[in-house]
């Protein structure tokens, strides 16, 4: 992926995350639940003082430091490995985008706005940035696993 496309994609993904959070705050009261796709997905405005899926509540400085380290390392890795395959680039793009999206909330609000509730499973309420992080990490693990299978 070319550097310009990567940066543009990063900006668009972070903007989508921030716009989704802005929309939730302006249309749904704190704690209110609104069906989005009945029986599948509801929207619920929550203020999360923890990490992804509400773990480690009230540890903001810990998350700021970890986020800066992870994003910094991902950018360093991209810069020093210019010939990564598209899947690793996509994984790192999602990880960086998700990290930045939640980092903006932590710095601006001292909490992260969560809103997506899966009605069909007992699971934590999460946000778009959490989704980026989850998919990015899963994709990166698959890439690394495949490399190991092929002896790279």
From Swiss-Prot:
Among PROSITE patterns, the record links this protein to: SPASE_II
Q: Which GO terms describe its molecular function?
A: aspartic-type endopeptidase activity
Q: Where are the transmembrane segments?
A: 5-25, 61-81, 84-104, 125-145
For membrane topology, the record states: Multi-pass membrane protein
**Alphabetical list of InterPro entries matching this protein:** Peptidase_A8 (IPR001872)
Listed A to Z, the keywords are:
Aspartyl protease, Cell membrane, Hydrolase, Membrane, Protease, Transmembrane, Transmembrane helix
The catalytic residues are 114, 130
Report the locations given in the UniProt record. Cell membrane
Q: In which pathway does it act?
A: Protein modification; lipoprotein biosynthesis (signal peptide cleavage)
Q: Which Pfam families match?
A: Peptidase_A8
Major enzyme class: hydrolase
Q: Which domain of life is it from?
A: Bacteria
State whether keyword Repeat applies. no
Q: What is its main location?
A: membrane
The EC code for this enzyme is 3.4.23.36
| Assigned GO CC terms | plasma membrane
- An individual GO BP term: proteolysis
Q: Its biological function?
A: This protein specifically catalyzes the removal of signal peptides from prolipoproteins.
Q: What family, per the record?
A: Belongs to the peptidase A8 family.
This protein is called Lipoprotein signal peptidase
């Amino acid at each position: 992926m070319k550097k310009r496309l990567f940066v543009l994609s990063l900006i668009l993904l972070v903007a989508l995350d921030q716009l989704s959070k802005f929309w939730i705050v302006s249309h749904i009261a704190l704690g209110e639940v609104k069906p989005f796709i009945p029986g599948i997905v509801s929207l619920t405005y929550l203020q999360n003082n923890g990490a992804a899926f509400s773990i480690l509540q009230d540890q903001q400085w810990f998350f700021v430091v970890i986020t800066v380290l992870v994003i910094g390392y991902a950018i360093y890795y991209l810069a020093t490995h210019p010939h990564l395959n598209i899947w690793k680039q996509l994984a790192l793009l999602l990880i960086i985008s998700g990290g930045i999206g939640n980092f903006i909330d932590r710095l601006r609000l001292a909490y992260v706005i969560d809103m997506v509730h899966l009605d069909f499973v007992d699971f934590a309420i999460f946000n778009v940035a959490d989704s980026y992080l989850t998919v990015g990490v899963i994709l990166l693990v698959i890439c690394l696993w495949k490399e190991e299978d092929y002896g790279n």
